[in-house]
Amino acid sequence: AEQMFAALVGDRAYPVSSEFWTQLLELPLTQQWPRDRVLQACHAFAQNNYHTKHLAKILIHLVWCLQECTSASSVSSSVYRKAINAAYISSIFLKFIIENAKADNWQELCLDIDKDEKGLENIPSDQSVEYFLMKGVLNYIGSVDVSPESCYLHHELLNLMLVLMSTQLCSGPSPEPKDVHPFIDAAMLQDSSIVASVVQKLLLNFVRRPQIPSNGSHPVFSDDGGPGVLQRVGSAAANFVLLPYYTFNYFVSASAEGATSQLADNSLLVLLILIHYRKCISMNESIPTDSVYMSDSNTNVKDAPAFHENPYCKALNNAKDIQFDHADVEGNAQNGPVVRLSFASLFDALGTCLKDESSVLLLYSLVHGNCDFQEYVLVRTDLDTLLMPILEMLYNASRKTSNQIYMLLIILLILSQDSTFNASVHKLVLPSVPWYQERLMHQTSLGSLMVVVLIRTIKYNLSKLRDVYLHTNCLAILANMGPHAHRLSAYASQRLVSLFDMLSRKYAKLAELKNDKALKVTSDQMEADIISDDTVLYCYLAS
């Protein structure tokens, strides 16, 4: 194994048709390397890859292995081993190159391989290596079910996807036309059938939460349970290549209670990255009308950045409940394949995992973009399944960032725009609220609890964050709920009176300041800040 890896990172270029690749990928990979040698190997691979093109070649072999896994009726363990090793080796060296790249066009990847080379006859001449790779990986993820035999390969492919799409993190906070992300851009160009199958399979992985067999053995680990050479490479590289995984940690920093599934978590993370990717349209770019990757007609290019249409986001927004008849789905004149899954199972899975931030983002994406799922949520009689975790997180707002609080409030704001929802929450009685510390709450309605928690969030924001937009969202939710309030608990009514008392005093203070002729334009800056923070409260009370 050591000699094979020395050849892989060395300066001798092996043709893609060489037996070297088969021998490398069939190794059990049980030897361990010290950290300094691992780093030396990573640097050598990145430097020699300019002329060996070994990265592109191993990615091509990965696709060939995946094609063999997909087409064969029964897949041998050696084929799985080759595919897993190819995915794992690729992800490690890709991660290192991406983190240390100096150019934003990713020339260090050296993916421009000569298509006339022997052995590359099966690769279409008009397809780039990155397109060929993404098509192979996405086709496997979307077409092959997770099983005890394939779960390790699915796991490595999802990890590889995270690395491939991490090039975004080397760009600025906002997309620009000059941004180049070769792999995720190639993913956006895939056929609609592949897109729909990938979105559906990633959602099903999240819902079903498949577990890796406890008695299984991962080919990249040695027989004694210790880490093999690739695991050693991965752990060492992680100390230097922090950007992709640690930045994506925004989505997955909070782990849900109960049984966890790495496959489910990674599937959700990959799905979120795919559906929220935005690529700017260049001012000089010509977009064909028959392209899958089209501009958004609602965006004015002159006034704001225009983005290509995201096919994965579109597939999620058009997803249908599996209980609908196929004729109903076809009658909606959907273009192309439609993602179909059980909304009931998705609803239950979200309710179980909502303490995890990535699940909150998925729920927001669904209720904001998918009208069918939003309607399904609104007609459910067990709304506490979703609302209780959200309210508990708002109750613990001091442990959350303002962005996380925003996401929770926007979900409530969207739902509270429906009169049926507002009426339903007051009819649903909760036997107890164990996480509410200030007082015991028995036999209180879900609507009363929402009022209490929202008012508590407002007061916390006034004392700590002083964010006017949080005021706006909280008060807007209360305003939506107001006409449908029914049988509020005594405690909720008391909190409403307390809120009105606080706001009325602030209103009086603001009115006095406004009407005070002695108030000068050069008043103290701190006082001006107070006026700015409380203006939204003044507007709400004045209206």
Task: State what each model feature region is.
Residues 51, 55-58, 82, 86, ...:
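Alpha-helical interaction elements in eukaryotic regulators
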